[in-house]
């Protein structure tokens, strides 16, 4: 009788150990995925900053061209 109880207890302990091992593996996978996603976020932020800078430069260029065009149109009206 006590041998059967010991076997059941041993099986439950082994099941708990197996579950813990699987959960530890899952935690490691999730940590790796989290690190990968954090890197992707950093890359996206860098790309965003570069695009914002480019957008700012293009807006400035557009403003300069609009001023030149307005000046040319003003000269054409004078003629």
Swiss-Prot record:
Annotated coiled-coil positions are 4-78
Annotated GO CC locations: cytoplasm
One annotated GO biological process: FtsZ-dependent cytokinesis
InterPro entries noted in UniProt? Cell_div_ZapB
- Output the Gene3D superfamilies linked to this UniProt entry: 1.20.5.340
Organism's domain of life?
Bacteria
Q: Where in the cell is it found?
A: Cytoplasm
The record's function comment reads: Non-essential, abundant cell division factor that is required for proper Z-ring formation. It is recruited early to the divisome by direct interaction with FtsZ, stimulating Z-ring assembly and thereby promoting cell division earlier in the cell cycle. Its recruitment to the Z-ring requires functional FtsA or ZipA.
Q: What is this protein called?
A: Cell division protein ZapB
Organism name: Cronobacter sakazakii (strain ATCC BAA-894) (Enterobacter sakazakii)
């Amino acid at each position: 009788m006590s041998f059967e109880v010991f076997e059941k207890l041993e099986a439950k302990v082994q099941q708990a150990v197996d579950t813990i091992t699987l959960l530890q593996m899952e935690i490691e996978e999730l940590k790796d995925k989290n690190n990968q996603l954090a890197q992707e976020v950093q890359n996206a932020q860098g790309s965003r900053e570069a695009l914002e800078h480019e957008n700012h430069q293009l807006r400035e260029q557009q403003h300069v061209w609009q001023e030149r065009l307005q000046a040319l149109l003003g000269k054409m009206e004078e003629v």
